[in-house]
């Protein structure tokens, strides 16, 4: 998301000198809302038939918070631990990440536009600083408040900003990993980092934290050295 959104915004700013928030959010709504509404409508009859009253009330609340892109806060304050068995009765638990993403979409374009217009030469430093601070918060939070750490944008933002940094470098420097040998080798290394995390991360692994840097780096390597 960070790579794609930053690429879209920066290309528009560089090409036109301006940025249309209206068109940006229209595109996001058209991409996200139809699928979200379909899932909600498809799951509602089954929830009505099979969930007990208490679980159905929770289900209905999760729908409302999901529509408001704040379900991450709802699930945190309701004490829901992601991956716990109780999550099986919360079909919209996965929308926490969509909420984090949409919160990023609301805040990031404004910050990027202001920085680009008035502090352009510091833009990359701003992105890197945001990445480092967010990663530091995530690593601290993983040990001190793991549930809050899991659900909120300040400790998840670095994962998105990693893509933003890649997009900035590509757009401003024009580098895309043109060496064919490196293009063959490094995507495999990136895939290894991701698969290693899938196989060896477990319930005892602090996440998100410095450990999470491994799969995020893997994704970044694949993006950077891919031909398309």
Question: Which functions belong to the PLM regions below?
Answer:
Residues 1-228:
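Membrane-interface helix/loop caps of multi-pass membrane proteins
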């Amino acid at each position: 998301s960070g790579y794609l959104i930053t690429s879209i915004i920066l290309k528009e700013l560089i090409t036109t000198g301006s940025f249309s928030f209206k068109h940006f959010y229209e595109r996001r709504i058209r991409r996200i809302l139809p699928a979200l509404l379909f899932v909600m409508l498809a799951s509602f009859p089954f929830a009505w038939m099979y969930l007990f009253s208490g679980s159905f009330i929770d289900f209905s609340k999760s729908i409302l918070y999901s529509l408001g892109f704040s379900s991450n806060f709802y699930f945190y304050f309701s004490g829901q631990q992601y991956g716990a068995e109780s999550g099986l009765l919360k079909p919209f638990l996965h929308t926490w990440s969509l909420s984090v993403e949409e919160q990023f979409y609301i805040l990031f374009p404004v910050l990027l536009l202001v920085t680009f217009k008035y502090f352009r030469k510091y833009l990359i430093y701003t992105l890197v600083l945001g990445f480092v601070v967010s990663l530091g918060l995530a690593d601290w939070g993983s040990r001190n408040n793991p549930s809050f750490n899991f659900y909120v944008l300040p400790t998840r933002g670095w994962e998105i900003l990693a893509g933003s940094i890649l997009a900035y470098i590509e757009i401003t420097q024009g580098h895309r990993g043109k060496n064919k040998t490196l293009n063959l080798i490094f995507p495999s290394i990136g895939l290894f980092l991701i698969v290693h995390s899938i196989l060896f991360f477990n319930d005892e692994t602090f996440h998100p934290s410095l450990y999470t840097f491994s799969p995020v780096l893997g994704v970044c390597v694949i993006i950077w050295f891919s031909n398309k």
